[in-house]
Amino acid sequence: MLYYMIALLIIAADQLTKWLVVKNMELGQSIPIIDQVFYITSHRNTGAAWGILAGQMWFFYLITTAVIIGIVYYIQRYTKGQRLLGVALGLMLGGAIGNFIDRAVRQEVVDFIHVIIVNYNYPIFNIADSSLCVGVMLLFIQMLLDSGKKKKEQ
């Protein structure tokens, strides 16, 4: 249940922040938070990361539905006693559903977190994207830990 609560929290935060951006900012408008480093910028994306597969909504609906079903299956089957795995999957589930809602309702994803890292203008993203990335990183860490345990047992 905890892992679904994590997903729900991510979905709520993601949708609330996107709603605030859509209601209070013009498309393309940028608000500096830390000048030359961090901005809130109203942006839309009809594709995936870096705009790849722009406009291929049917593809995103199909893939995201399969991913959501897979994550729920893994949560139900493999997270007992595996807290890190459960948190990773909860974050991934929340992120996947957050962007799925945008695609289903708006036919585009609302992005707004704009970061510049040492003169590199990083692609604008949102809370769902961040949640997916952190979830994948935690999943990778879990896999490394599991691999280390198996080697120790041999």
UniProtKB/Swiss-Prot annotation:
<dbReference type="InterPro" id="IPR001872">
    <property type="entry name" value="Peptidase_A8"/>
</dbReference>
<protein>
    <recommendedName>
        <fullName>Lipoprotein signal peptidase</fullName>
        <ecNumber>3.4.23.36</ecNumber>
    </recommendedName>
</protein>
<keyword id="KW-0472">Membrane</keyword>
<feature type="active site">
    <location>
        <position position="111"/>
    </location>
</feature>
<keyword id="KW-1003">Cell membrane</keyword>
<comment type="pathway">
    <text>Protein modification; lipoprotein biosynthesis (signal peptide cleavage).</text>
</comment>
<keyword id="KW-1133">Transmembrane helix</keyword>
<dbReference type="GO" id="GO:0004190">
    <property type="term" value="F:aspartic-type endopeptidase activity"/>
</dbReference>
<feature type="transmembrane region" description="Helical">
    <location>
        <begin position="52"/>
        <end position="72"/>
    </location>
</feature>
<comment type="function">
    <text>This protein specifically catalyzes the removal of signal peptides from prolipoproteins.</text>
</comment>
<dbReference type="Pfam" id="PF01252">
    <property type="entry name" value="Peptidase_A8"/>
</dbReference>
<keyword id="KW-0378">Hydrolase</keyword>
<dbReference type="GO" id="GO:0005886">
    <property type="term" value="C:plasma membrane"/>
</dbReference>
<dbReference type="GO" id="GO:0004175">
    <property type="term" value="F:endopeptidase activity"/>
</dbReference>
<comment type="similarity">
    <text>Belongs to the peptidase A8 family.</text>
</comment>
<keyword id="KW-0645">Protease</keyword>
<dbReference type="GO" id="GO:0006508">
    <property type="term" value="P:proteolysis"/>
</dbReference>
<feature type="transmembrane region" description="Helical">
    <location>
        <begin position="85"/>
        <end position="105"/>
    </location>
</feature>
<keyword id="KW-0812">Transmembrane</keyword>
<feature type="transmembrane region" description="Helical">
    <location>
        <begin position="124"/>
        <end position="144"/>
    </location>
</feature>
<feature type="active site">
    <location>
        <position position="129"/>
    </location>
</feature>
<keyword id="KW-0064">Aspartyl protease</keyword>
